[in-house]
From Swiss-Prot:
Tissue expr: Expressed in anterior and posterior midgut primordia in stage 11 embryos. In stage 13 embryos, expression is high in the developing midgut and hindgut. In stage 16 embryos, expression is elevated in the midgut, hindgut, and in a small region that will give rise to pharyngeal muscles and to the stomatogastric nervous system. In larvae, expression is predominant in the gut, and head, presumably in pharyngeal muscles.
Keyword terms: Mitochondrion, Ribonucleoprotein, Ribosomal protein, Transit peptide
Name of the gene: bonsai
Molecular functions per Gene Ontology: structural constituent of ribosome
Annotated knockout phenotype: Mutants exhibit a strong systemic growth defect and die before reaching wild-type size.
Subcellular location: Mitochondrion
Function according to Swiss-Prot or TrEMBL: Essential for gut mitochondrial activity. Might be involved in tissue specific growth factor production.
Name of the molecule in the record: Small ribosomal subunit protein uS15m
Source organism: Drosophila melanogaster
Quaternary structure note: Component of the mitochondrial ribosome small subunit (28S) which comprises a 12S rRNA and about 30 distinct proteins.
């Protein structure tokens, strides 16, 4: 082992595993959290089911006049919240179908089918939030989401205005399947993050260098004006052709005045901002 290390240090570093070395860049990559297939973020459901009223009765007994005279303990037996869960699912399903059905007896159109599936999907999603290990409901929910997505695909192909209308009524987002699947790998992600880091570093250094040059503009122009005046005086005294004209010197002085005014305005703006931040 020592012999291999000596060879690697002496000659070409072909024995050193440089790909396994830790980078000095302060870049940390975290694998994106996997979203379950039954979550609303994946299924496309933008809204949840409305909360159930505490005094909501079973649909069959809403118009029963005898319940108005009955005792509270008797009324509680006919409340929807005190009965089986499938009755609540049926209640939500019927209410959602009423919003999209074409007529009172419409239960077989594409809109009614999508409303039924959406109500059941959202009920199952609420169940999975409370019981995430329920495998049977998870499988049913996944199959129902895929079936609804297939129906939406067909409706989008057949009647696009009706497709948009049903999405608006049911608070859905249609997510078509991707054309190709792309794996998220650590290597590719680190390459992209490194490119972004290098680009930001380059921009920061260029900005710092630009500010440094801007800070040197006024001293540079002052020194340049002095030198131009000196060169002009020497050329006149030596009786040689004058290359530095008064117009050049005047232009440099005007540029110097503009830079000083700009610097004063920036200083006033920065001081005003600091005062406002201090008051806040």
């Amino acid at each position: 082992m020592n012999k291999l290390l000596n060879i690697a240090q002496a000659g070409h570093r072909q024995f050193v595993r440089e790909y396994a070395f830790k980078s000095d860049l302060k870049i940390k990559w975290m694998r994106p959290e996997k979203i379950a297939c039954y979550k609303p973020e994946k299924s496309g459901d933008l809204a949840k089911l409305p909360p159930l009223k505490a005094d909501e009765l079973l649909p069959e007994y809403r118009d029963c006049k005898e319940l108005d005279k009955a005792d509270e303990s008797v009324k509680s037996l006919f409340k929807l919240s005190n009965n089986a869960s499938y009755l609540t699912t049926k209640f939500y399903r019927d209410e959602m179908v009423k919003e999209v059905q074409r007529h009172a007896q419409d239960f077989g159109s594409m809109e009614a089918k999508l409303a039924k599936m959406t109500a059941v999907i959202r009920r199952y999603q609420e169940h999975m939030d409370k019981h995430p290990r329920d495998k049977m409901i998870k499988v049913r929910l996944k199959e129902l989401i895929d079936k609804r997505k297939k129906f939406l695909k067909y409706l989008r192909r057949w009647d696009y205005p009706r497709f948009e209308w049903i999405l608006e009524k049911l608070d859905l987002v249609y997510k078509p399947p991707p054309t190709h699947f792309h794996w998220i790998t650590r290597k590719e992600s680190l390459q992209k993050l490194t490119d972004i880091y290098c680009e930001n570093l380059k921009e920061e250094r260029l900005e710092a260098y630009h500010k440094q040059l801007q800070a040197q503009q006024i001293p540079f122009l002052e020194e340049a004006i002095k030198k131009m005046q000196f060169v002009r005086q020497e050329q006149i005294s030596c009786d040689v052709p004058v290359t530095v004209t008064e117009e050049k010197i005047a232009d440099s002085k005007r540029q110097l005045e503009m830079l000083k005014e700009l610097q004063q305005a920036e200083a006033a703006a920065s001081s005003k901002k600091q005062n406002e931040d201090g008051f806040n």
